[in-house]
């Protein structure tokens, strides 16, 4: 029946009987899914990159354990070397032993910083930044090289003392027992230096694993 009222709709508004969505003025959609404006696309990260970042987060726990080991081993190493003293013999008498102590102090400080930075991804659940991974890899390489050099230098001096002794001020050195405690502390410090070196090397290998996706993808 004609009621005298015309059915007027605002321009741009239409109803599709076969669709649950009703267009409203301004181009919106009522009772339906949101429409992405033309020219805008959602770019989801690739599944490969997502998997890699997930694995990196899982490796953060192992990395943290290695950092703690590096710190503990380096602290023990420089503590033993600093306490190496007997009958006037001290670590500063030998340049290589001073080098061992100095490098272990540096590595211990570096490990503290890495422990703090390693906790952050575990707490936040986010993947480390690419720049951080590159810097960490370089620092790990440098730390490993310095620890290896210090350990090798200290080991060569320890072998020289054990085989030929130190004739000048300490009799026959470790042979006649005048500085056996000094020798024992120095040798133990060198051993812990090498253990710290191996932990840093493993951390460096993990750094390669973490960096690989950013270099390939």
Curated annotation (Swiss-Prot):
<dbReference type="Pfam" id="PF04535">
    <property type="entry name" value="CASP_dom"/>
</dbReference>
<keyword id="KW-1133">Transmembrane helix</keyword>
<feature type="transmembrane region" description="Helical">
    <location>
        <begin position="62"/>
        <end position="82"/>
    </location>
</feature>
<feature type="transmembrane region" description="Helical">
    <location>
        <begin position="188"/>
        <end position="208"/>
    </location>
</feature>
<keyword id="KW-0812">Transmembrane</keyword>
<feature type="topological domain" description="Cytoplasmic">
    <location>
        <begin position="120"/>
        <end position="141"/>
    </location>
</feature>
<feature type="region of interest" description="Disordered">
    <location>
        <begin position="1"/>
        <end position="21"/>
    </location>
</feature>
<feature type="transmembrane region" description="Helical">
    <location>
        <begin position="99"/>
        <end position="119"/>
    </location>
</feature>
<comment type="similarity">
    <text>Belongs to the Casparian strip membrane proteins (CASP) family.</text>
</comment>
<feature type="transmembrane region" description="Helical">
    <location>
        <begin position="142"/>
        <end position="162"/>
    </location>
</feature>
<feature type="topological domain" description="Extracellular">
    <location>
        <begin position="163"/>
        <end position="187"/>
    </location>
</feature>
<keyword id="KW-0472">Membrane</keyword>
<protein>
    <recommendedName>
        <fullName>CASP-like protein UU4</fullName>
    </recommendedName>
</protein>
<feature type="topological domain" description="Extracellular">
    <location>
        <begin position="83"/>
        <end position="98"/>
    </location>
</feature>
<dbReference type="GO" id="GO:0005886">
    <property type="term" value="C:plasma membrane"/>
</dbReference>
<keyword id="KW-1003">Cell membrane</keyword>
<feature type="compositionally biased region" description="Basic and acidic residues">
    <location>
        <begin position="1"/>
        <end position="11"/>
    </location>
</feature>
<feature type="topological domain" description="Cytoplasmic">
    <location>
        <begin position="1"/>
        <end position="61"/>
    </location>
</feature>
<feature type="topological domain" description="Cytoplasmic">
    <location>
        <begin position="209"/>
        <end position="217"/>
    </location>
</feature>
<comment type="subunit">
    <text>Homodimer and heterodimers.</text>
</comment>
<dbReference type="InterPro" id="IPR006702">
    <property type="entry name" value="CASP_dom"/>
</dbReference>
């Amino acid at each position: 029946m004609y009621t005298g009222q015309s059915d007027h709709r605002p321009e741009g508004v239409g109803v599709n009987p076969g669709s649950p969505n009703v267009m409203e003025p301004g181009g919106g959609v009522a009772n339906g899914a949101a429409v992405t404006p033309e020219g805008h696309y959602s770019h989801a990260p690739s599944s490969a990159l997502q998997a890699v970042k997930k694995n990196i987060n899982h490796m953060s726990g192992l990395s943290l354990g290695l950092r703690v080991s590096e710190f503990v081993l380096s602290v023990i190493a420089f503590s033993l070397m600093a306490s190496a003293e007997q009958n006037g013999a001290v670590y500063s008498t030998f340049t290589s032993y001073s080098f061992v102590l100095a490098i272990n102090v540096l590595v211990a400080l570096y490990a503290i910083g890495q422990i703090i930075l390693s906790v952050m991804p575990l707490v936040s659940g986010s993947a480390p930044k690419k720049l951080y991974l590159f810097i960490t890899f370089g620092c790990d390489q440098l730390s490993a090289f310095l620890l290896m050099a210090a350990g090798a230098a200290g080991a060569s001096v320890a072998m020289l003392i054990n085989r030929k002794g130190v004739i000048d001020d300490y009799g026959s050195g470790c042979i006649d027992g005048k500085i056996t405690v000094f020798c024992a502390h120095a040798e133990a410090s060198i051993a812990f230096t090498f253990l710290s070196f191996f932990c840093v090397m493993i951390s460096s290998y993990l750094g390669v694993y973490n960096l690989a996706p950013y270099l390939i993808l």
